Amino acid sequence: MEKRENPYLRYLRRERLPHIFCAGCGNGIVLNSFFKGMEMAGIDFDNIAMVSGIGCSSRIPGYVNCDSLHTTHGRPISFATGLKLGNPSLDVVVFTGDGDAAAIGGNHLIHGARRNIDMTVICINNSIYGMTGGQISPTFPEGSYGSTAPYGALEDPFDLAELVTAAGASYVARWTTAHPLQLANSIKKGLKNRGFSFIEAISQCPTYFGRKNRMRSPVEMMRFMKENSLNRRKALKMEPDEVEGKIIVGEFANRPQPELCEKICSMVDEKSGRALDMIRSAYRDD
């Protein structure tokens, strides 16, 4: 029987395989959903520029055969902003994680959303610092265990989708790795949106989060995410105590609005035109 090849292998740098991700990591699922969403959106792969910071998920662009920037910790959105302003015709995609985006990069995240600059940010949220030993991140669930929370986390976690929605992003969605088709569809919408798009992918880290919280199997973790998810449309009609502890998934914002690059270009055209009119007027007066 002929072995079928994954159709998305053509987008990868095969010479860099095998990857460094742990067995059962959700990064591969998210990348697969990205390729599917990209094809559904009709985006030209050669026009994509990927940007990432530091963390497990930030290693993803290194395996993708496109132009990419591997930047400093917490700064991928800043670099992506400069890239987009320098060449507005590019389709800029940021791969980041919960630590990279919500901790050291938190200010850059909310201001990127506020500016509504055209880029698609895919945040793989596994609630943990997986490259440095399993320290807890700003999205770590209260009461769960990590290497820096041996008796259980005491802090309330960030709700990234709600945070970015409040900051002004024009498209925001959240799914889990147990919802790959829905995730791909939201990535498609994010890529087609003219503005700041934020897609949060709740993912499993069996190596650190799973072992510390008695969910050693990736399948067990994904089953938990699937069974514990609740669509936002339904959640909005329920009482707060009914949705407590649930993973709220779905679209949080889909509101087209003026994009920063377009506003800058319009301003330049307007001001340049006025300057030329003033020069012509001066010559006519002479």
Curated annotation (Swiss-Prot):
CDD domains associated with the record: TPP_OGFOR (cd03375)
This protein's UniProt keywords: Oxidoreductase
Record-linked SUPFAM superfamilies: Thiamin diphosphate-binding fold (THDP-binding)
EC number: 1.2.7.3
Keyword Oxidoreductase: yes
Pfam families xref list: TPP_enzyme_C (PF02775)
Keyword Oxidoreductase in annotation: yes
GO BP terms, alphabetized: organic acid metabolic process; sulfur compound biosynthetic process
GO MF annotation, one: 2-oxoglutarate synthase activity
InterPro entries: 2-oxoacid:Fd_oxidoreductase (IPR051457), THDP-binding (IPR029061), TPP_enzyme_TPP-bd (IPR011766)
First-tier enzyme category under EC: oxidoreductase
Superkingdom of the organism of origin: Archaea
Catalytic activities: 2 oxidized [2Fe-2S]-[ferredoxin] + 2-oxoglutarate + CoA = succinyl-CoA + 2 reduced [2Fe-2S]-[ferredoxin] + CO2 + H(+)
Subunit structure of this chain's protein: Heterotetramer of the KorA, KorB, KorC and KorD subunits.
Record PANTHER family: 2-OXOGLUTARATE OXIDOREDUCTASE SUBUNIT KORB-RELATED (PTHR48084), 2-OXOGLUTARATE SYNTHASE SUBUNIT KORB (PTHR48084:SF1)
Protein name as it appears in the record: 2-oxoglutarate synthase subunit KorB
Organism for this UniProt entry: Methanothermobacter thermautotrophicus (strain ATCC 29096 / DSM 1053 / JCM 10044 / NBRC 100330 / Delta H) (Methanobacterium thermoautotrophicum)
Lineage: Archaea, Methanobacteriati, Methanobacteriota, Methanomada group, Methanobacteria
Gene giving rise to this polypeptide: korB
